[in-house]
Amino acid sequence: MHKVPRAIRAMGINAVRLYNRLEVSVAQPVPDEPVLFVCNHGFGGVIDLNVFAFAAAYDDLGLSREVIALTHQIAWTLRAGKLLEPFGARPAARENALDAFEEGHNVLVFPGGDLDALKSWRHRNEIVFAGRSGYARLAMEAGVPIVPVVTAGAGESLLVLSSGRRIAKALRLDKTAFRVKTLPLSVSIPWGVNVGVVGLLPYLPLPTKLQTSVLAPVRPEPDESAEDFAHRVHSAMQAELDELTKDRLPVIG
């Protein structure tokens, strides 16, 4: 990573450690081999506190391998992809992940995409992968373990009144170049009440407390299908998020 991206990354990490009072816990050391990190979204895409929380946790793990972050195609549609590539971002595609593993890198995915990233306040403590199992199939094909990483609190950095899935479906946004299934109605600083803006553009998050848990590595069982493997990973992640949020006070933590 070059000097400028490294400095921006460090600023983001410092922000979540200080402003968001980030706490990181690690269940087991990450094995010294390429792994697939599977994370949940907080709110937003690239501009998501969970991205910086993961970066902070990665530093705490003391790993030297580069991380390739598979990122929604919308970043390149909006001509922002080239700005993200110095940070390790690549379009979310199977070939890009396999190439990264072949080169000895770790790979980071957020399987829920915009469904998980732009969910409403009342669903903020739910991990929405919508039954997707491609990430599990990828890990099985590459022969790498999955390391789940769960972050709680980022969904309280603003107020999302609705995910706007019905509006997005009515507008057929998933059929456009943007390929999105949500158009959230939210209240944030400085945008106030808006539809669809926050998540694509930066906003000033509330000082919500973040907690990140790096779970133990997971490998498929003999004869386990990709769907069953994905279900097992998702269930473990949701159970951890439930534990992190069971006594939580919004924003305060």
Regions found by a protein language model. Give the residues of each.
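Helix-to-loop junction immediately C-terminal to a conserved catalytic motif
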Residues: 11-41
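A broad, low-specificity signal marking well-ordered, structured residues that form hydrophobic/aromatic
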Residues: 22, 35, 67, 107, ...
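A generic local structural motif
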Residues: 22-25, 55-56, 94-95, 199
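Pocket-edge structural micro-motifs
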Residues: 26, 39, 56, 71, ...
